[in-house]
C-alpha cells in the first residue's frame, strides 16, 4: 500500500475537490471556488518550509524562534507554468545572518516539498529577524 492516497473529483467545470485523508481540499483552475493549482502548490511549499525552518532552529540550538511568517511570491511564464518562487521569512527572534543562513540551509534539507521541486523552482529565501 502506498504512503499517500488521494481522490480528486470534478463534477463540472474546472473546480476539483480532493479527498486527502479526512480533509477536503478545494482547488479551482479558474480561482472561482478555491485557489488555482499553482497557488496551492506555493502555499503547500510555504506550509512545509515553515515547520522545517523551526526544526532547523531547534537543531542549531534556537528552540524558540517566536512567531514565524512566510510571505511567498511566485512568477509564471507565458504558459502559466511556475517559473520562480521566493520566500520572505519573518522571524520574531533576532539572530545573526549566519545563524539564519544555517537554519535556512537545514530547512531546505528537511522540507519534503523543497526536495520534490526541480532546482530552478526551489525558493529564493530571505530572512528578516526581529520582525515582530
UniProtKB/Swiss-Prot annotation:
> Sorted alphabetically, which Gene3D superfamilies does this protein's record hold?
3.30.300.20
Per UniProt, which keywords does this protein have?
Isopeptide bond, Ubl conjugation
Q: Does the entry feature the keyword Transcription, yes or no?
A: no
Q: Which Pfam families match?
A: OsmC
Signal peptide annotation: none
Record cross-link Glycyl lysine isopeptide (Lys-Gly) (interchain with G-Cter in SAMP2), residues: 59
**Family of the protein in this entry:** Belongs to the OsmC/Ohr family.
Q: What is the protein's given name?
A: Uncharacterized protein HVO_1289
Species? Haloferax volcanii (strain ATCC 29605 / DSM 3757 / JCM 8879 / NBRC 14742 / NCIMB 2012 / VKM B-1768 / DS2)
Amino acid at each position: 500500500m502506498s504512503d499517500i492516497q488521494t481522490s480528486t473529483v470534478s463534477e463540472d467545470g474546472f473546480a476539483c475537490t480532493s479527498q486527502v485523508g479526512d480533509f477536503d481540499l478545494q482547488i479551482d483552475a479558474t480561482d472561482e471556488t478555491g485557489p488555482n493549482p499553482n497557488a496551492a502548490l506555493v502555499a503547500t511549499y510555504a506550509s512545509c518550509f515553515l515547520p522545517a525552518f523551526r526544526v532547523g532552529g531547534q537543531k542549531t540550538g534556537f528552540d524558540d524562534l517566536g512567531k514565524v511568517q512566510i510571505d511567498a511570491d511566485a512568477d509564471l511564464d507565458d504558459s502559466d507554468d511556475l517559473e520562480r518562487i521566493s520566500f520572505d521569512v519573518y522571524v520574531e527572534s533576532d539572530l545573526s545572518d549566519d545563524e539564519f543562513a544555517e537554519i535556512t540551509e537545514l530547512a531546505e534539507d528537511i522540507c519534503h516539498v523543497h526536495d520534490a521541486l526541480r532546482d530552478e523552482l526551489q525558493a529564493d529565501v530571505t530572512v528578516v529577524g526581529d520582525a515582530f
